[in-house]
Amino acid sequence: MILEDLLMVLSCLALHILWKVQAVPILPLSLVPDTFDDAYVGCSEEMEEKAGLLLKEEMARHALLRESWEAAQEAWAHGRHKLTLPPGFKAQHGVAVMVYTNSSNTLYWELNQAVRTGGRSRELYMRHFPFKALHFYLTRALQLLRGTGGCSREAGEVVFRGVSSLHFEPKRLGDSVRLGQFASSSVDERVARRFGNATFFNLRTCFGAPIQALSVFPEEREVLIPPHEVFLVTGFSQDGAQSIVTLWSYNQTCSHFNCAYLGGEKRRGCVSSRAGQPESFSTEALALQSGKTLLLAPGELQLSRAGP
């Protein structure tokens, strides 16, 4: 009788664990082609001229954006004098970072939802993407804070990212993937684990920018990774209900969009931008160590998964 009871308890425990694992959605890691991934290569100055008015129009239509921006603007005015910032870094760039890092509201989540699906077409972006100015200012902030050259200029940053509600899994080792959104990470593994363990990422990023000095929560020691950075999947394992993923940056970005607000259409392939040349596109195929590349046109690449 005791043995039967014990087996019953173990059976129930196993079912409970299985239910918990299955209750967390599983999403494949990929190049997320529907991401709005504009890096504004060659048009950042023109976008700076237009983004101010665009921001006012978008704030008029989105109350949370207006409230968040105004609060961050006030905080920026009080703290700006304490910061050492790179040339070209404007107040709007700093305010955009503060808006994003303020997790006391849902704006960062709404922005990333829009980013992950807003790149299906330029028409969809123009008509329905509600954060065009915020996306531009945040993208430029990361570019200016990180500087040009990626890992060609300085060593990549080893960071950690915890996700609480989703299991991300690669199809296989050697895949080329992007995170497909603005992805928060930390140089402190303990901090990252506080944000979740359904998926835990170990990353080496070449284009993620340290934003601790600008963050609403500086103790998180955050590094913010842009949607368009390309990574190699170098490791994957599962420990109970946890997926553990290791990603290594290619020191490369790729985008389907460039200067979309100014008329740039979505391109068939993901166009790579070589580190160190942020205002021009590479005309060569990416030297992917474990994947395949299909050359489409000068500067255009279709990154495909590794394997036969």
Curated annotation (Swiss-Prot):
Residues 63-253 form the TR mART core domain. Its EC number is 2.4.2.31. It is found in: Secreted; Membrane. Coiled coil: none annotated. It catalyses: L-arginyl-[protein] + NAD(+) = N(omega)-(ADP-D-ribosyl)-L-arginyl-[protein] + nicotinamide + H(+). One of its GO terms (cellular component) is extracellular region. Keywords: Disulfide bond, Glycoprotein, Glycosyltransferase, Membrane, NAD, NADP, Nucleotidyltransferase, Secreted, Signal, Transferase. The active site is at R161, S184, E222. It is an enzyme of class 2 (transferase). One of its GO terms (molecular function) is nucleotidyltransferase activity. It holds the Pfam family ART. Residues 1-23 form the signal peptide. Belongs to the Arg-specific ADP-ribosyltransferase family. This is Ecto-ADP-ribosyltransferase 5.
